[in-house]
Amino acid sequence: IQHQHLATELPKLISAYGYKHYILDNNDLDNAITQINDCDENHTICVIKKDTFDKVTLKQEHQLDLSDCIPRGEFLMSINKQFKDTDTLFIGTTGNTAREMYSFMPDTNNFYMAGNMGGALSIGFGAAKAGRKVIVCGGDAEFVMHMGGLTTAGRDANQVNLTYILFDNKQNKSTGGQDTYQSHVDYISIAKASNFSVVENTIESLNEFKYIMTDIKNKSSLKFMCVKCGLDDETPRPPLDIVKVNKF
């Protein structure tokens, strides 16, 4: 929703902060280059309209090989089968995680954090504090956006029924598949230090995932698990009327 409003009001917001701005010229390349150079040399912001640039495929040396990993969609379909028509609340982080949940989890109770990266765990924690059974579906890049949410949830570990699933595909798929450069981050140890009950190993098989999800379905705890996953084909965005839902 923030994208819908920010896109139309961005020039006003820039002016309110006291900056100048250009709308990047998408008809005259020479003028566009002049605008970009001017923005680089002065306190001027360049606003780029949608579809100004064509889609660019990453160079081969920057592409990650995830061919040996199970696509995230298969894990999500497993969740849909296990939690179909239950009152468990699923919070989906922004980007492809939410899009794939919309496509592969049609029978679960989903809340999508569209355009709001890093807040999924905090929203899920709030719902869990209110008495809901919550499962947050996050990603590796999203994990580091608001790590304070981990320690906040960990403080009330005995009072909430909340599971945080981190789907690690090592990239930002929705913005082009760029490497997150987070191979040095030990997600499991960070969650454990924040007082989560953790699955000690990274999940790579569908059978192990199903087994753990069955345990989560039947128990109440503050749980964390990291799932190594691959990529699915592009899936559609959830419709705006679904994204606009503001109640669980």
Listing of model-derived features with the role each one plays in the protein:
Residues 25-28, 96, 203-208:
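Short beta->alpha linker loops
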